[in-house]
Amino acid sequence: MSEIRKNDHRLMQVLLAPVISEKATLVADKNEQVVFEVAPDATKQEVKAAVELLFKVEVDSVNVLVQKGKQKRFGRSMGRRKDVKKAYVCLKPGQEINFEAEAK
C-alpha cells in the first residue's frame, strides 16, 4: 500500500468520472456502492487508494468490469465504440460520497 501511496500523480489519473445512471443510483442506495469509470490499465488496489485519497472515505471492496463497446454505424462504414472499464466501489458502513457537495 505504501508503494501505491507514493505515486499520487498516478492516483489522480485512475478515476475518470462517476457513472450517473439509473442502475448506478439503485446500487448506491441499496448497497452503499459508488460506480466510477476508471482508466483501462487501473487495478483494484489503485482504484481503492484513489477513492480514499480523493474523497477521504474508507473503502471496503472494489469490483471491476470491462464493458465492451458496441458496433455502430458512422456514415457508410461500420465502427466500434471504445471499451469502458468501470469500478463498483463498496464503502464501509456509515461512509458516503456526495457528488453535489464535492462539486461546489
From Swiss-Prot:
GO terms for molecular function: rRNA binding; structural constituent of ribosome. Keywords: Ribonucleoprotein, Ribosomal protein, RNA-binding, rRNA-binding. Pfam families: Ribosomal_L23. One of its GO terms (cellular component) is ribosome. One of its GO terms (biological process) is translation. PANTHER family: 60S RIBOSOMAL PROTEIN L23A. Part of the 50S ribosomal subunit. Contacts protein L29, and trigger factor when it is bound to the ribosome. One of the early assembly proteins it binds 23S rRNA. One of the proteins that surrounds the polypeptide exit tunnel on the outside of the ribosome. Forms the main docking site for trigger factor binding to the ribosome. Belongs to the universal ribosomal protein uL23 family. This is Large ribosomal subunit protein uL23. It comes from Burkholderia multivorans (strain ATCC 17616 / 249). The lineage of its organism: Bacteria, Pseudomonadati, Pseudomonadota, Betaproteobacteria, Burkholderiales. The gene is rplW.
